């Protein structure tokens, strides 16, 4: 009997994502707030004027400033299909997908809360309690076990891709680096985030990955949450690899009374060699949660803390009066009719 709790979820390999035209799809959304920007593009909070709910729209540039392709449309479509296939309470749902000549758009479930990265940045000590870490490990364990059982590796598990809502629910997002299994296995990786990738994922040219790459990354996230810093963060892949080979500092050297069983689970999952790690997310979470903390109390604590941190933050919501036909841009609002 696995120690982490189970939820009913559905795998839908034939979820339709028929590329509703950008004019038809985006016309219904009113921009409210820019949630994040970066090399991936931007994420905007928008109001769905039809269903009267908030959604998050990820806008991904297809052409960079030099006029060269920035993101292949097939890569974006692959991300949309992968996330849409996995319908699970701990995975952020993709609602729709479209593109025009300049951008691709993923319309996603809006999670009202914050990322684990923001949570750790703002909470006292920049770390989790044992109970909070147990709740996060339990939720991510369920999400990843479900994904793996349906032939999907995430390959970009990090605090920025873990969302916590006001009820203490934890959801995994961003399947942009995901790999789907085939008759020959998962093959190699297409990248990831330095500090959370194991050696086989860092080796983009010849390395091959499987479920144990996600085991490694999940262990990095839980280690960071408990100890206050990621064990293998570095400026370059080579430096990160050196840190991995050198081994992580034992948590008990950083935190008094660290549970021995949880420490053993983390150190095993952080092994440089895949064969030395647990063979599955389920096996890792069973060992980790056996001695870490209370999942139920952790969820209650996350709910309370996210509420308190959100109350301290002044919410900025852009006025949308007169912008019903608008779509976000980096510099404000562009009328939908101007998009070719």
PLM regions: where:
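Activation segment signature within eukaryotic-like protein kinase domains
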Residues: 136-137
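Activation-segment/catalytic-loop signature of the eukaryotic protein kinase fold
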Residues: 97
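AlphaC helix of the eukaryotic protein kinase fold
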Residues: 61-85
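Protein kinase glycine-rich loop
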Residues: 32-38, 43
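Protein kinase catalytic-loop region centered on the HRD/HxD motif
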Residues: 141-152
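Conserved short submotifs of the Hanks-type protein kinase catalytic core
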Residues: 101-115, 119
